[in-house]
Amino acid sequence: MASAKKSVDIKNIRNFSIIAHIDHGKSTLADRFIQMCGGLQDREMQAQVLDSMELERERGITIKAASVTLYYTHPNGQEYQLNFIDTPGHVDFSYEVSRSLAACEGALLVVDAAQGVEAQSVANCYTAIEQGLEVLPILNKIDLPQAEPERVIHEIEEIIGIEATDAPTCSAKTGLGVEGVLERLVDVIPAPEGDRDAPLQALIIDSWFDNYLGVVSLVRIKQGRIRKGDKMLVKSTGQVHPVTSVGVFNPKHSETDILEAGEVGFVIAGIKDIFGAPVGDTITLSSTPEVKTLPGFKKVKPQVYAGLFPIDSSDFEPFREALQKLQINDSALFFEPESSDALGFGFRCGFLGMLHMEIVQERLEREYDLDLISSAPTVVYEALTKKGDTIYIDSPSKMPDASTVEDLREPIAECHILVPQEYLGNVMTLCIERRGVQKDMKFLGNQVSVTFEIPMAEVVMDFFDKLKSCSRGFASLDYNFVRFESSSLVKVDVLINGEKVDALAMICHRQDARHRGIALVEKMKDLIPRQMFDVAIQAAIGAQVIARSTVKAMRKNVLAKCYGGDVSRKKKLLAKQKEGKKRMKQVGSVEIPQEAFLAVLKVER
């Protein structure tokens, strides 16, 4: 049923998003806005209203962009429509942020008044400024005894370079000062531009697949208007679909009669093809196909690749469908079919980082009820062959023979780290251990901004966790890929009883190979159950074995019946047993348990 949506003049609309580092109170501030503008009754309120995914609520992080439309009455008596688009704060989801910002005219930069500016907020803030948004800094958690507003204001001006002397202060938890934030927001952020009588032009910010409704698209109307019953044209596919419903989230799904220029809402047109309304595409009406296509979003390149395999091989098709449904909602996910001798059929998937990989795997297991196993994650390497061809390697099995390769290059990431001075030494040590090269260092008040170039393979695995633990959680990180650089890389194979197990192979730097080979072999020794014969576990680079360990055989005590007796009799029995074990070893195969594959992921540096 369509609810009567208030018609608001375009100059009274404000589209904004909130930029903040993890834990600086972004979702809590959003909750306060929703409560103060009457989006939900008090009994329906819950913490993190916009984080609808169970995973988001559990981990306390925002993964997906969400939108909500609120109505706010300003002290000057005018009513404003606020369209708030939520953005994630974690470094792995920065592409989601740029998508959300494309739909806004302004952004609130929320900074924790106790912790100060963090690297991720700086990166997202620059993205907003590049896209021409008006940025309004806000100091949150002002009620904490350790809050230092003057120092933080100085940091915002020093590090980010935006005016913050009269930044509003608030406490999203208690609601103190939030009214003032809403007032400033309306005054500072510009109204959207757009002609409501022009032909329809709308940008798809996000899409997701609903089993009953088909594709649901979150759109920002740039020009014109769209109603239920209109025939809409998706520019990239050229397909025309009748619009079955339009509406807004407030924050519940509520249908309306019309969406007009300047507004943000959802459009459902019964599209059953998963790729029927790609994110970043332009929608118009079938009567005006000549409307210009809006600039979309740049494709993000996956940084980490891993094989995902269903434990039950009959799940292969449901797994493919689940990945396709996830991909429409998560444009950074990449996948292609892959088969492994050890793990069967599955997909080689590309992710933005380890958190992204964990989240995708958990979403597949929870939302689609699949049991999955993953192979060791790896970054993309570049190889120059002796014939002069350049090939990209996203899996150890694709690594060409060393004799055919002229040069191997690994991806280098530029890491910007913000850290309080007292933890600088620990952070520098960590970066150097990870083969980092220092490029820049600036002292900004109590904080230090350091820039290192570190191989991507070192950054994406567990660098973020280690950085947090060596700085008691105060250091923050933002990284981006800069180039490929020649490096001494080797492929370490794992052999069990002389047979290579493809799913356990890994690519690493030559100086780490021996240490990681030994660690892996020792770990495997504990995980492979004892057999009736000796099992040799080896790590090798090419034909050279760098580590070995043996799982000893279980054996019967054949001397038990001898009591005293002649020593030659005992020797004969032992020799007979040995012969039997030897024969067994030739025909016996070793069942490798699932934990052994996960051991590769957990080999400490």
Curated annotation (Swiss-Prot):
GO CC terms, sorted: plasma membrane
Molecular function terms, GO-annotated: GTP binding; GTPase activity; guanosine tetraphosphate binding; ribosome binding; translation elongation factor activity
Subcellular location: Cell inner membrane
Membrane topology of this protein: Peripheral membrane protein
Presence of the UniProt keyword Magnesium in the record: no
Organism domain of life: Bacteria
Chain ranges of the tr-type G domain: 11-193
GO biological process, one term: positive regulation of translation
Location, primary (coarse class): membrane
Catalytic activity: GTP + H2O = GDP + phosphate + H(+)
EC number(s) on file: 3.6.5.n1
Cross-referenced Pfam families: EFG_C, GTP_EFTU, GTP_EFTU_D2, LepA_C
SMART domains reported in the protein's UniProt record: EFG_C
InterPro entries reported in the protein's UniProt record: EF-4, EFG_III/V, EFG_V-like, EFTu-like_2, G_TR_CS, LepA_C_sf, LepA_CTD, LepA_IV
UniProt-annotated binding residues for GTP: D23, H24, G25, K26, S27, T28, N140, K141, I142, D143
Alphabetized UniProt keyword annotations: Cell inner membrane, Cell membrane, GTP-binding, Hydrolase, Membrane, Nucleotide-binding, Protein biosynthesis
CDD domains: EF4_II, EF4_III, LepA, lepA_C
Record bears the keyword Nucleotidyltransferase: no
Coiled-coil residue windows: none
Family named by the database record: Belongs to the TRAFAC class translation factor GTPase superfamily. Classic translation factor GTPase family. LepA subfamily.
HAMAP family according to UniProt: LepA
Protein name in UniProt: Elongation factor 4
Gene: lepA
